[in-house]
Design a protein with these regions (language model features):
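Histidine/acidic-residue-rich, glycine-tolerant segments that coordinate divalent metal ions
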Residues: 1-88
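Short glycine/serine/threonine/alanine-rich loop segments
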Residues: 72-75, 94, 116-118
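Structural recognition of alpha->loop->beta junctions
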Residues: 87-107
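Active-site-adjacent C-terminal substructures of enzyme catalytic domains
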Residues: 4, 102-154
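Conserved beta-strand positions in the central sheet of alpha/beta enzyme cores
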Residues: 38, 96-98, 121
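Glycine-rich tight-turn/loop motif centered on a GG-T
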Residues: 8-16, 48-59, 94-96, 134-153
Length: 154
């Protein structure tokens, strides 16, 4: 699938807009046999219109996907870098959170209070490779602009 936000990248991602579309796609994925649905709740440093500290899904969209997944006994995981995206994950029972690197004090408190059922994967492997061995994917200017090395230091 060619995504509009990353025109030079083929992806298996599905794009949705609005709670009803998230519900529909979640049901479709479950009918196709998936066990885990991954949501991309925050942006990322390489997405031009939505940086890592941006929350790109609304609460209603996350709630809609979570409602369907939980009703069918499926799990959710999430790309969640921004503080608000981490909070949305906890509020809606998303058990696996990737990154969480911009979590504020409130988000950290929520993670601590719910640590018995949450799994946080900082996913620093990609960041380390991009920062120091990513010549095939990124220019030095992109590495600096995306803050990969700073991310490893924080």
């Amino acid at each position: 699938m060619r995504t509009l936000h990353m025109p030079k990248v083929d992806s298996m991602a599905l794009m949705a807009d609005g709670p009803e579309e998230y519900r529909r796609l979640a049901r479709e994925l479950i009918r196709e046999g998936v066990d885990i649905i991954k949501l991309v709740i925050s942006g990322d440093s390489f997405v031009p219109h939505a940086g890592s500290e941006t929350t790109i899904m609304s609460e209603a969209e996350v709630a809609a996907a979570a409602e369907v997944a939980h009703a069918h006994g499926k799990r959710l995981s999430a790309h969640a870098r921004s503080a608000e995206s981490v909070k949305l994950c906890v509020r809606h029972g998303i058990k696996v959170i990737y990154h969480a690197n911009y979590a504020d004090e409130e988000a950290l408190d929520l993670l601590e209070a719910n640590k018995d059922w949450l799994f946080i994967s900082p996913n620093i492997g990609f960041t380390a490779i991009a920062a120091y061995e990513g010549d095939d994917w990124f220019t030095e200017e992109q590495v600096q602009a995306m803050g990969f090395r700073e991310g490893l230091d924080s």
